[in-house]
A protein has these predicted regions:
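Glycine-rich phosphate-binding P-loop
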Residues: 62-78
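PAPS-dependent sulfation machinery
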Residues: 90-192
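Short His-Asn-centered micro-motif
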Residues: 63-65, 193-197, 282
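Conserved phosphate-donor/acceptor-positioning beta-strand/loop module used by diverse small-molecule
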Residues: 195-196, 206-231
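N-terminal signal-anchor transmembrane helix
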Residues: 40-62, 93-95, 100-101
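Flexible loop/turn segments at secondary-structure boundaries
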Residues: 200-203, 223-226, 279, 286-289
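PAPS-dependent sulfotransferases, especially Golgi type II membrane carbohydrate sulfotransferases
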Residues: 1-45, 50-51, 157-163, 168, ...
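Post-Walker A helix-loop "phosphate-sensing" segment adjacent to the P-loop in P-loop NTPases
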Residues: 79-89
Length: 365
């Protein structure tokens, strides 16, 4: 964030920062000052070219709830040399990456752990990354504001339903989204593949902004999604907190956001033109990656499958030693997920687990 955005977000949340997170706030203030300065330099050097940039083609959007396999699919599609994705550096420094990435990406790599804390997936400046981080940083309008302020929640500015945003917020969000994509187009000049879990609830907005866009919806066993989402909030997004988080509130957030986003998706999926939506299961992508990708390319009428697969196969071979986290599902969790997310078990062919006995747990990875 720039200083102006950070101050605005702090004001919305009554500057309620837990004392233990004051060093984190101090870091954000210093970083905000640096972002503000570099953003001015980028505007002076590249501003006119960025404003004139045009998208090569409508974007391809990967849809799916958090921990549903969107990152894996994003990484696979990034193997296609005719496509491009936002990188981690671009998503985390959206105000100035056009200007700063030639030298800033190396500095970023020197300070990153190399792996994401919630799943050990590689994280470097050049790895594909979701654009929601960039949108949160550019305008402070994103569900990810809940990660910064888990107690106050940032009000309606963190809504997953665009219709619930405060007046003027959607237009501001759209302007910043388009600016970010113009920067990507100016930098790379290829069709952009994007992935952001909240896009599940933005179908009508995205279609209005980008007629001709393609959508890929990936689902995963809801029990695994729930358990992995808990891990995400505990060990991934927790690094962003400026307030003390209530585990019960975060648990409810995971459950309710899933229901709300899928209600919005089911309502608006009919707006997507025929031939522009492809759906798959994460489990099928894991076991039959070539078949899934080949069908995806055919259904969405995308070129270059064979070239993409040559590189994707190399990427998959490098993942040979990767081990996913294992999670244990107990009865209380099974009951909540089975009841509240029942609609997706039936729709996508996942079996409901019968009640578990006391002390019994089921393992998921």
């Amino acid at each position: 964030m720039t200083l102006s955005t950070l101050f605005r977000v702090l004001l919305r949340n009554q500057a309620r920062v837990n004392w233990r997170y004051l060093p984190r706030l101090a870091f954000l203030l210093v970083l905000g000052g640096l972002n503000s300065y570099l953003a001015c330099l980028e505007q002076a050097v590249d501003g006119e070219d960025i404003a004139a940039a045009q998208l090569v083609a409508p974007p391809i959007f990967i849809l799916g709830y958090w921990r549903s396999g969107t990152t894996h699919l994003h990484n696979l599609l990034s193997c296609d040399p005719s496509l491009t994705c936002p990188t981690a550096y671009q998503a985390m420094f959206p105000h100035h990456f056009v200007y700063s990435q030639p030298w800033g990406a190396g500095i970023f790599n020197a300070f990153t752990p190399g792996k994401r804390p919630m799943d050990n997936v590689a994280l470097y400046g050049a790895t594909p990354h979701e654009e929601e981080m960039a949108l949160a940083a550019l305008c402070g309008i994103s569900p990810y504001m809940q990660a910064l302020f888990p107690a106050t929640g940032d009000g309606a500015y963190s809504a997953v339903d665009p219709a619930k945003l405060p007046p003027g917020a959607l237009a501001e969000w759209q302007a910043n989204f388009l600016l970010f994509l113009k920067k990507l187009s100016f930098s790379k000049g290829k069709r952009i593949v994007l992935k952001s879990p909240p896009h599940l609830g933005r179908i009508s907005v995205l279609l209005n902004m980008f007629p001709g866009a393609k959508f890929i919806h990936i689902v995963r066993n809801p029990y695994a999604v729930y358990l992995s989402s808990q891990k995400l909030w505990r060990s991934g997004l927790a690094y962003s907190h400026l307030q003390k988080a209530d585990p019960r509130r975060l648990e409810e957030l995971i459950l309710s956001w899933y229901m709300e986003l899928y209600a919005l998706f089911e309502r608006d999926r009919c707006l997507i033109p025929p031939g522009s939506l492809f759906e798959l299961r994460f489990e099928d992508l894991e076991t039959s990656p070539r078949e899934c990708l080949e069908t995806l390319y055919a259904e969405l009428d995308l070129p270059n499958f064979e070239l993409c697969w040559q590189r994707a196969a190399q990427y998959l071979r490098k993942l040979g030693g990767y081990k996913k986290n294992r999670h244990r599902l107990v009865e209380e969790e099974r009951a909540k997920v089975s009841q509240r997310w029942a609609f997706n078990f039936a729709r996508y062919g996942y079996p409901l687990i019968p009640p578990l006995g006391q002390g019994v747990a089921v393992s998921f990875s």
